[in-house]
Amino acid sequence: PFFKWYHRIYQVLMFFIFLGPIRLILLIISFIICCTITISIVAILKTLKCDLNKYRHMIIAHARFWLRIFLFCLGIGWIHVEGEFDEDARFMICNHIGLLDPIIMIQIRYLSFVIKKEFSEIPIIHDMIDVCDPIYVERSKPCGYTNKIISQAEDKSKDQIMIFPEGTVCNGNYMLKFHRSAFLTNYKVQPIV
């Protein structure tokens, strides 16, 4: 059916009066609960001197539930996956077109991310990211972190490594220069779109 202009205004008005605030409140609550419980579990495991690597997937599985609500509140209702993941690939590469890319990838797969070192200085975000066993890289140093990435790729007990080879968020209209770290190994690299 064709909607007239005043129907559209009514829809927008009702969204801002009713649905918008509810989604915003749910978004904030889901993020706070996710952070609180995840950080609490990690703190308890560290206090008990437990190996965090043994419980990493359990913690991420718990966080997925709350992050799924978070994504739903942002309007991401379904994540469609086509094709198969190559279990032999140690690296996955993807263009970084939005700030939600890592959260969406965590919903699909257990991954370890290559992340800029600045994120290790943000208190709550740092604690949440550490659950994924990230590799922090310093952009000011052009080399040196490649060895860390390769050594983590060689450890088959660890999760596959997700790299955004452009190293930053871009709009997807053009390609930036790729960092070579994932391509310097003999391991398979799986592209993700």
Q: Where on the chain are the PLM-derived regions?
A:
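Hydrophobic alpha-helical transmembrane segments of integral membrane proteins
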Residues: 12-49
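Catalytic core of membrane glycerolipid acyltransferases/transacylases, capturing the structured
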Residues: 35-65, 71-74, 84-143
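Eukaryotic intrinsically disordered and solvent-exposed regulatory patches
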Residues: 77-80, 98-101, 122, 147-151, ...
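Eukaryotic beta-rich interaction modules
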Residues: 7, 15-23, 60-61, 71-80, ...
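Generic structural "secondary-structure junction" signal
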Residues: 21, 121, 139, 171, ...
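Conserved Motif II region of HX4D acyltransferases
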Residues: 88-93, 113, 148-193
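Extended, low-complexity, polar regulatory segments
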Residues: 1-6
